[in-house]
Structure formats: structure tokens, C-alpha cells
């Protein structure tokens, strides 16, 4: 696994994007930047196994395909879809899932622009994965994004979402941010790396309040929303129609 050293260099202080350099180190970056990341992978795989009836799922923002590869290796899967806007990410995902290539289709597309020809009508998913994706979608477009994804799936779809959040209480919010930054330091990032990445993510990663996420999911057609993961300022949501 390539080690993330992107933000060691101050010259990389530009707006964050999932370019080729980020893709090369993404697996290391996300495991050292998201508290409980490996637990999140376990939750996704176990929840899929319990809830998916069709045994067909769609991972939107699949990045390097880690989640897809895990589900394929641990569960019965009839088919799955990996969607991402980064061709570099998808190239890695295809290689990672190579031994299961007959069971997966990868698509380079932005579902905000439409959903034509994304899935096979005979292989309809009933399980949606949105792992740390919505926070990178502009707030006014999030409901449309979810609605478009939901339109691809069966009427009994379950959606699993993981997001970074903010808190109503300003003091609690700042203390949890400080705790999160300390946690990243314990994972080998220097203070300058943490600071540089934080600046690069400004106006790119926009977290919602917990209550805003609940309202978003319910207004998008999910009647039941439950918490399935909580660690510092990260939450997991189990959303059911």
C-alpha cells in the first residue's frame, strides 16, 4: 500500500480533488483519516448480508473498490455496480475486483447528470452504499443525488450512509474537531500535514448536522432512519423505505 505523503509538501496547498496522486495513496489516506474505517467496512458487509434480498448492490462513490471487493469475498452476490467520477479510482477498483469481474460493472459517471444506462434492468439493486460521499456533494444538490440513486433501485431499497457531521453546540463541535485532529496525529500525520489538508478541504467537504442528514434521508423517501455507527464526528445511517 502506498503511503499518503501528499500534504507534507506546502506546494500541494490547492483545493482538494480526487486526482491521480490522491488515488495512488487513497487506501492509506482513508484508513488513517476516518475513525473506525475498517469497522465501517465490516458494518457494510454484514448489513448487506442481512438485508439484501436481490443480492444486488450499488456502491456510489466506490473509489478504489475496497468495499465492493470485501462484500464479494465475504457474501453471496448476484451482481453489483461501482460508480465513481474518477477514472483513476475505477482503474484501481477494477484491478482489485478482477477475480469477480463477471459480477461487477464499474461506471465512470456523475449521477447528478442523469441515470440512463447505469444499471441492467434485469439486475436491479436493493442495497445502496454511500460511504463518505454526500459531504462532497453541494448541499442544494444532495436530495437530487439521493433521489437519482434511489430511482435505480427496487422499491424495498435499503441505503447505508456514512458521513462526517457537525454539532449544534459550538463548543462541543470545536472539541470534537480538536479530538479528531489529535486522532489523525496518532495515525502518523504531522501537524503541518493535518493543517494543509484541512485548508485544501475548505468548501470541498461540507458536513451536515446530524438532524439535517435525518431530514434529508426522510425527505428523499426513506421512512426509517437509524444510527448504525458513531465515532467522534462521524456517523453511520441505516435508511429503509
Curated annotation (Swiss-Prot):
<feature type="binding site">
    <location>
        <begin position="61"/>
        <end position="63"/>
    </location>
    <ligand>
        <name>S-adenosyl-L-methionine</name>
    </ligand>
</feature>
<feature type="binding site">
    <location>
        <position position="131"/>
    </location>
    <ligand>
        <name>S-adenosyl-L-methionine</name>
    </ligand>
</feature>
<dbReference type="GO" id="GO:0002098">
    <property type="term" value="P:tRNA wobble uridine modification"/>
</dbReference>
<keyword id="KW-0808">Transferase</keyword>
<comment type="similarity">
    <text>Belongs to the class I-like SAM-binding methyltransferase superfamily. Cx-SAM synthase family.</text>
</comment>
<dbReference type="InterPro" id="IPR029063">
    <property type="entry name" value="SAM-dependent_MTases_sf"/>
</dbReference>
<dbReference type="Pfam" id="PF13649">
    <property type="entry name" value="Methyltransf_25"/>
</dbReference>
<comment type="function">
    <text>Catalyzes the conversion of S-adenosyl-L-methionine (SAM) to carboxy-S-adenosyl-L-methionine (Cx-SAM).</text>
</comment>
<dbReference type="InterPro" id="IPR005271">
    <property type="entry name" value="CmoA"/>
</dbReference>
<dbReference type="GO" id="GO:0016743">
    <property type="term" value="F:carboxyl- or carbamoyltransferase activity"/>
</dbReference>
<feature type="binding site">
    <location>
        <position position="198"/>
    </location>
    <ligand>
        <name>S-adenosyl-L-methionine</name>
    </ligand>
</feature>
<feature type="binding site">
    <location>
        <position position="37"/>
    </location>
    <ligand>
        <name>S-adenosyl-L-methionine</name>
    </ligand>
</feature>
<dbReference type="GO" id="GO:1904047">
    <property type="term" value="F:S-adenosyl-L-methionine binding"/>
</dbReference>
<dbReference type="InterPro" id="IPR041698">
    <property type="entry name" value="Methyltransf_25"/>
</dbReference>
<comment type="subunit">
    <text>Homodimer.</text>
</comment>
<protein>
    <recommendedName>
        <fullName>Carboxy-S-adenosyl-L-methionine synthase 1</fullName>
        <ecNumber>2.1.3.-</ecNumber>
    </recommendedName>
</protein>
<keyword id="KW-0949">S-adenosyl-L-methionine</keyword>
